[in-house]
Amino acid sequence: DISSDGRYVLMMTSRSRLTQRPTTLSTLYKLDVQTLQTETLVAEDGFLGGATFSPDGTQVLLTGSPECLDGIGLNLPEGLIPNQYDYQMYIMNLADKKIAPMTKDFHPSVQQTVWNKVDGQIYFTAENRDYISLYRMNPSNGKIQQLEAKEDLVKSISMADNAPVMAYY
């Protein structure tokens, strides 16, 4: 992802480790394109899925299984292994690198995410039983609201950069 001011790029690398679980480890970096300095945001995590900047560039929205980020998204009894495809959302504050699990107690699996520049809300799709539903989350308090959609399977969403307009199918 590229920050809205164009100065920073989020990039991930991965390496294989076939001798133990997880077998692939990913590292997330923030690159300053003016100085070419990199900063490691997440090192060798086996369950991290993706990352995008907040509209103001002060936070990063991370997605991954409940086991990513040292398991801060886990909500199962000790000894149980969560579904690796049950993607959750986490928000990292770039100033202090603190990470908050935003969907730890949210049961549908997160799929596509869009952090909207106009209203600052995070819009996302999630597997909801046999449906793929549309949701909105307030990143400041974690409140999630299911949005009414005319489709049972919302496969993709897109939002205008400077207007309160969304398209989905």
Residue map of PLM features:
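Residue-level detector of Asp-centered blade-edge/turn motifs that repeat once per structural unit
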Residues: 4-5, 55-56, 117-119, 159-162
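A flexible loop/linker signature enriched in serine peptidases of the S9 family
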Residues: 1, 12-27, 40-49, 63-90, ...
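Glycine-centered loop/turn positions within well-structured domains
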Residues: 7, 39, 58, 97, ...
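C-terminal structured domain segments across diverse proteins
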Residues: 91, 158, 163-165
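Hydrophobic beta-strand positions that form the internal "hydrophobic ladder"
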Residues: 9, 57-60, 121-122, 164-166
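Short loop/turn segments that connect beta-strands within beta-propeller blades
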Residues: 32-36, 93-97, 138-142
